[in-house]
Amino acid sequence: MLLIPAIDLKDGHCVRLRQGDMDQSTTFGENPAAMARQWIDAGARRLHLVDLNGALAGMPKNYGAIKSILKEVGDDIPVQLGGGIRDLDTIEKYIDGGLRYVIIGTAAVKNPGFLKDACSAFGGHIIVGLDARDGKVATDGWSKLTGHGVVDLARKFEDWGVESIIYTDIGRDGMLSGINIDATVALAQALSIPVIASGGLSGMADIEQLCAVQDEGIEGVICGRAIYSGDLDFAAAQARADEMG
């Protein structure tokens, strides 16, 4: 089970949001590259970056910070990034810059042709982020709720060749209220590609519950507020996950 530290970028700083609200952000670091190194030193095997400004603007807005992280990480571990990725040129720029995976969210839902083209041009590098509330997909930095069901969309995207799905329960994100295990397992069981859990990780109990069901197709979990607030010791959690197989 991959425990993947999240580095959310707003105005060049590392922050955490509550339920995706840009007005409810807490700054955890002024130096994104140093934050990346901190998690690598703690045993991270992948990093999850989010360009929060970019997600709302529809274009990269924290490229300087992202570039500094990629330079710091080098070939140590893979890095994945979401937020503001709406065209093939942006994907190419990021992958050429050292990014392993790009995460397409809103654009996958609103512009499926773009996702198809991205999977065709950059096979193995495309992850789709599906953010949902009550089983329905949300877009535009979580500000708009669609009528699309998570499982139906994920199955379609799987057919197009996406590498994996990141499933975020918006109602729990940044709330330390526990991962929505049942919904994550249900999605993983409906797919043959891996699912990465996200939203609400609160502590070691969540890690143990996810590890217990990882054979259903759950590859990892995004670790956000819990590892910044001290509710979860990242190194200890990764060690526990390894111990559980």
Swiss-Prot record:
Active site, UniProt feature: 8, 131
Record localization: Cytoplasm
Keywords attached to this entry: Amino-acid biosynthesis, Cytoplasm, Histidine biosynthesis, Isomerase
An example molecular function term from Gene Ontology annotations: 1-(5-phosphoribosyl)-5-[(5-phosphoribosylamino)methylideneamino]imidazole-4-carboxamide isomerase activity
Main location: cytoplasm
EC number, UniProt record: 5.3.1.16
Keyword Repressor in annotation: no
Reactions mediated catalytically: 1-(5-phospho-beta-D-ribosyl)-5-[(5-phospho-beta-D-ribosylamino)methylideneamino]imidazole-4-carboxamide = 5-[(5-phospho-1-deoxy-D-ribulos-1-ylimino)methylamino]-1-(5-phospho-beta-D-ribosyl)imidazole-4-carboxamide
Pfam family, one: His_biosynth
Pathway assignment: Amino-acid biosynthesis; L-histidine biosynthesis; L-histidine from 5-phospho-alpha-D-ribose 1-diphosphate: step 4/9
GO biological process, one term: L-histidine biosynthetic process
Cellular component GO terms, alphabetical: cytoplasm
Family: Belongs to the HisA/HisF family.
Protein name as catalogued: 1-(5-phosphoribosyl)-5-[(5-phosphoribosylamino)methylideneamino] imidazole-4-carboxamide isomerase
